[in-house]
């Protein structure tokens, strides 16, 4: 089985998350995409202290109508920071027959040298870099820490970095939705409409539960 991994705080989940997951699923013929909310993200302060369970509930609502999308709360049961490499290792142990594709935004990939045990990520699964409009595939090579560039071969025609482990880093261009969870929280905090920025079920849940009414 080919499985995508999309992690994040999902505070809240929005339509760009869903569209990126769907584009990766379609492009790479994935059987499923696992949405994995971060319990304690190492690179991002949790603005507003929205509980992990609430963020998981929003993702479940957002993905309920797509049989290829699933939600895992595995990071909620693990103490300490939610490091991606630990999640990937746990998934590989749980699903030893799966081929994994770790989905990451281009902004995050440019900073991957600061991630915990980042070298092990490249040696554990494929990566798909979802690019913002205007970003170039050549940025893949430029973003790699100098210490590990020799571990890769770059194939510009395929927009792919091949790692010596046999896994690859793929560049997915043309993801046009520039939506941020921060801006959605700001609108919700002010009582403004967030319609069409999040799925209808998520909008209703946010409004009914007043999740961001007292945020910030």
Swiss-Prot record:
A GO BP annotation: NAD biosynthetic process
Sections of the chain in a coiled coil: none
Record's keyword terms, sorted: ATP-binding, NAD, Nucleotide-binding, Nucleotidyltransferase, Pyridine nucleotide biosynthesis, Transferase
ATP-binding recorded as keyword: yes
GO molecular function: ATP binding; nicotinamide-nucleotide adenylyltransferase activity; nicotinate-nucleotide adenylyltransferase activity
Pathway recorded for this protein: Cofactor biosynthesis; NAD(+) biosynthesis; deamido-NAD(+) from nicotinate D-ribonucleotide: step 1/1
SUPFAM superfamilies (UniProt xref): Nucleotidylyl transferase
EC number(s) reported in the record: 2.7.7.18
CDD domains for this protein: NMNAT
UniProt keyword annotation of Nucleotide-binding present: yes
Record's catalysed reaction(s): nicotinate beta-D-ribonucleotide + ATP + H(+) = deamido-NAD(+) + diphosphate
NCBIfam families in UniProt: cyt_tran_rel (TIGR00125), nicotinate (nicotinamide) nucleotide adenylyltransferase (TIGR00482), PRK00071.1-3 (NF000840)
Family: Belongs to the NadD family.
Protein function: Catalyzes the reversible adenylation of nicotinate mononucleotide (NaMN) to nicotinic acid adenine dinucleotide (NaAD).
Record protein name field: Probable nicotinate-nucleotide adenylyltransferase
């Amino acid at each position: 089985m080919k499985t995508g991994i999309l992690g994040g705080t999902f505070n809240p989940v929005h339509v760009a998350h869903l569209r990126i997951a769907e584009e990766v699923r379609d492009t790479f013929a994935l059987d499923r995409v696992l949405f994995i909310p971060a319990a304690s993200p190492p690179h991002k302060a949790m603005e507003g202290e929205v509980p992990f369970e609430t963020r998981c509930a929003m993702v479940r609502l957002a993905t309920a109508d797509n049989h290829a999308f699933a939600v895992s709360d595995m990071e909620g049961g693990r103490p300490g920071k939610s490091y991606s490499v630990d999640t990937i290792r746990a998934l590989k142990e749980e699903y030893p027959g799966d081929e994994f594709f770790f989905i990451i935004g281009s902004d995050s990939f440019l900073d991957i040298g600061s991630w915990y045990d980042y070298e092990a990520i490249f040696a554990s699964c494929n990566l798909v870099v979802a690019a913002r409009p205007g970003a170039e595939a050549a940025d893949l090579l430029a973003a790699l820490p100098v210490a590990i560039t020799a571990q890769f071969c770059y194939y510009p025609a395929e927009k792919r970095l091949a790692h010596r482990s046999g896994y690859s880093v793929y560049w997915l261009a043309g993801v046009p939705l520039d939506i941020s969870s921060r801006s959605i929280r700001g609108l919700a905090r002010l009582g403004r409409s967030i319609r069409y920025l999040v799925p209808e079920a998520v909008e209703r849940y946010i409004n009914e539960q007043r999740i961001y009414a007292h945020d910030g």
